[in-house]
């Protein structure tokens, strides 16, 4: 995210979902489910279901609408070439995820396009009526997310 903001560019990766969430939601969901004696032995996917499971495209679209950012959508390899030789780039420590071919000449990140959606029935059922809700990623949540996770205050960054 920080690299995309610095470059004012987003790679064209389709339906890449990263399970974006908040610590508040995750901890509240885990604590609530763990207290239920019917939970042991069941699987709980805390990745959000449906439209709340934002793709990379959705996330940056929301940043543009909420804060006035403007991101160029560029082919993945062009985007990668913009930062791959800069060791100061936030993504540089995980360069291999973007560079090394894993299958069919594609790197790990490219392979995660068109990401599957996790089954969510147990989580939804166990959280029903609890008041524990996944984040909406509306403007106030996006602002907190940017400030707390990467130290960028959106009002200043978009200018």
What do these predicted ranges mean?
Residues 33-106, 125, 152-159:
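Mid/C-terminal beta-alpha module of Rossmann-like enzyme folds, strongest
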Residues 117-159:
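Amphipathic terminal alpha-helices
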Residues 21-24, 54, 118:
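Residue-level signal for the nucleotide or nucleotide-sugar donor/cofactor binding architecture
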Residues 17, 50-51, 110-111, 132-134:
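Short, contiguous acidic/charged loop-to-helix segments that flank catalytic cores in large enzymes
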Residues 1-25, 29-33, 45-47:
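A conserved pocket-lining segment of Rossmann-fold NAD(P)-dependent short-chain dehydrogenase/reductase
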Residues 5-13, 102-107, 125-129:
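Short glycine/proline-rich turn/loop motifs
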Residues 25, 58, 122:
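Ca2+-coordinating acidic residues in Ca2+-binding motifs
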Residues 24-35, 61, 143, 147:
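Amphipathic alpha-helical segments that line or abut small-molecule/effector binding pockets
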